[in-house]
Amino acid sequence: MWQSVGLTVLVIVATLICVLLFMLFGWYVVWQLFLSKFKFLRELVGDTGSPQAETEPSESESERSSPPTPRQRPKTARQRVIPPDSTT
């Protein structure tokens, strides 16, 4: 009687451990292949030491080193909005 109960408990515990390990391994693989590419998710997890985070240049460095793209190109005098002088 007690042997069958013990064996049943052992099977249930072993099954739960196997399922938990399988889920953790799956999350690790998904993180490495897909989720770690998103900066927002890395910030949520607090992952600042990843190689990808270190190799990505900051915005100020990339703006200085790269030529201006059409979005970053300075506006011409006609396109600029000049604020009215408050001294007059």
Curated annotation (Swiss-Prot):
Q: Which UniProt keywords apply?
A: Membrane, Transmembrane, Transmembrane helix
Where primarily located? membrane
Q: How does it sit in the membrane?
A: Single-pass membrane protein
CC terms in the record's Gene Ontology section: membrane
From the record, give the cysteines joined by S-S bonds: none
Localization (cell): Membrane
Asked whether the keyword Transmembrane helix is assigned, the reply is yes
Determine if Transmembrane helix is one of this entry's keywords: yes
**Which chain regions cross the lipid bilayer?**
10-30
A Pfam family recorded for this sequence: DUF4750
Determine the domain of life of the protein's source. Answer: Eukaryota
Q: Where is this region: Disordered?
A: 48-88
Q: Which family does it belong to?
A: Belongs to the SMIM13 family.
Q: What is this protein called?
A: Small integral membrane protein 13
Q: Which organism is it from?
A: Danio rerio (Zebrafish)
